[in-house]
Amino acid sequence: MFFLKKQEKIQVLVFFVGLSFFSPVAFSADFDNEFEEKPWKEIEVQLPPFPERENLIPFEVGSVTDKQFFIDGDSLSVGSDEVIRYTMVVIGSGGAQNISFEGMRCTTGERRSYAFGRSDKTWSRVRNGQWGKIRGGSNQGHVNLFSDYFCNVGERAILSPEDARRALRYGRSATFR
């Protein structure tokens, strides 16, 4: 650069300074900031109508229980927050029913309850309901919903209520034919 005139030196300097703004390092910093994952935010949840017997879809939990497990097909939804929401009905051998409106996050393996059904066919909202990990034991119905119907690892996620109903009625593998 020592053989260039002063004005040419300034032009070359400006060129290289300008070029540095487009360097991979400068670009990658902006790129990372633009595409940072935003923190997950749950959408506002509306309670569904109380389940009707004709809308209940049975699902298998295994031979270790004498309870019957159902999902209300009309309550199924998949939110923009990627939560599958549903009403679960569990009927014990003596006929007692437990009804709950719940959500499941396939990406984190968590679930939460939003409300429980009362005998007068109304909902009782859960106060301070928190997301918790899906584990076996007394929650076997949730484990089966997660692994066998809604969130099977390695397969496409349930994207719509129709996908979820099809998985419950015909098995997980029938969902994506």
Annotate the PLM regions.
Residues F2-L13:
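Bacterial N-terminal signal peptides that target proteins for export
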